[in-house]
Amino acid sequence: MRDETPEQPAPLRFGYTTGSCATATSLAAARLLLAGQADDAVEIVLPKGQRVMMRLEFCRATADGAEAGTIKDAGDDPDVTHGALIFARVALAAAPGVRFHAGPGVGTVTRAGLTLPVGEPAINPVPRQMMTTHLEALAAEHGYAGGFDVTIGVEGGEALALKTMNPRLGIVGGLSILGTTGIVRPFSCSAYIASIHQGIDVARANGIAHIAACTGNASEDAMRAHYQLPDMALIEMGDFAGAVLKHLRRAPVARLSMCGGFGKLSKLAAGHLDLHSRHSSIDLPLLAQWAAEAGANEALQAAMRAANTSQEALKLAQADGVPLGDLVCAHALRVARDIVPPSVAVEMFAIDRQGRFVGAAR
C-alpha cells in the first residue's frame, strides 16, 4: 500500500492592526459624507505601501455625520482584539485638519511618558498619520477644504482593556489603537516588548526611580510585598529580560530589581535574554558546576546533573547547605550589569513555586 503524503501545516495567517481598522472605517465614513458612496469594502494603503481591501460591517449616515465599522481580524495571532468591532464616526468641520476623539472602548492617556500627551485619546501616532493621509487625499479628490472630526471606538473595548497593560500604563477607559506597519504578524513579540518599554517610560516620566521587572504574577506579588512598590513601578517582563535590560541603556532608572522563578533566573544567569522554553533551556550541568564552586561534593553534583527539573536541583542543593539560589542570582546579576549603564543599581531575586525567596544578589 502506498504511503500517504504527510499533510503540510498551513502557514499562519497575517491580520490587520486596530490602526488599519480605524483607517478603513474613517475613510469609508468620510467618503459617504463627501461622495455619497456607502461602501461594503474599502482599500487602504499601509505604511510600507501595500494596498489591502478591508471588508466593512456597515457604513451609514448619522444625525451629525457618518459611521462605519469592521471586525478586527488578527489572523492567527492570539490578539485580545481579534473579532472585536472597530468603528469610526466622522463629522465634517469648518476648520481644516483632522482631530481625533476617543469613542466608547478607546482609552485616554492620563500619565506622562507615552508617545501621546496626557488627555489625548489613545490613538497612536502611526494610526493617526494613516488616517490623516487617507482623509487628506479624499478631501483633495473632492475639492473639500474643511476638516474632519474622527471618533474611534471599539465595541466592548473597556472590558478588553483590562486584559492588557493599559490600566498600568495609565490609559483609562479602553484600548489603544495601535500599529506601526498596519499588519499583525502571528505570535509576534513586538507588541509585548513595546508594552515593556512603555511601562519603563511611564515610570520614569512619573518620577519613579526604582522599578521591578518580574516574570509573572508570583514574582510581581513578591516584589510588591517586599518593597511596597506602586503598580506603576512593576514591569511585567514575562520572558523578555533582554527587552528590559536593553531599554535601560537609553532610558535608565536609578534602581532595577529583577525577580523571577528560579528556573527563569537560571536561564538569565547562563546568558539567555529570552527566557521562553522555545529559545532557551535550563543547563543542569552548569548549575552543578556553580554548586561545585560553592563546595558541593561529587555526589551532590551528580544528583543535580541527573535532576528532572531546576526545582529538583535547587532542593538537592538546599538540603546540602549549598546556596544555589544566591549563586544563580549572582551570575544573573553579572549578565545584567554587562548590559545596563553603570548608573543603574541592579539586584536579582529568585523565588520558588510558592512565591518564597530562594536567592538574592546585589
UniProtKB/Swiss-Prot annotation:
Family per similarity comment: Belongs to the CbiD family.
Name of one Pfam family that matches: CbiD
The keyword Nucleus is assigned to this record: no
Annotated pathway: Cofactor biosynthesis; adenosylcobalamin biosynthesis; cob(II)yrinate a,c-diamide from sirohydrochlorin (anaerobic route): step 6/10
EC number: 2.1.1.195
Reactions mediated catalytically: Co-precorrin-5B + S-adenosyl-L-methionine = Co-precorrin-6A + S-adenosyl-L-homocysteine
Gene3D superfamilies: CbiD-like
Keyword S-adenosyl-L-methionine part of the UniProt annotation: yes
InterPro entries: CbiD, CbiD_sf
Gene Ontology MF terms: cobalt-precorrin-5B C1-methyltransferase activity
GO biological process, one term: methylation
The protein, known as: Cobalt-precorrin-5B C(1)-methyltransferase
Keywords per UniProt: Cobalamin biosynthesis, Methyltransferase, S-adenosyl-L-methionine, Transferase
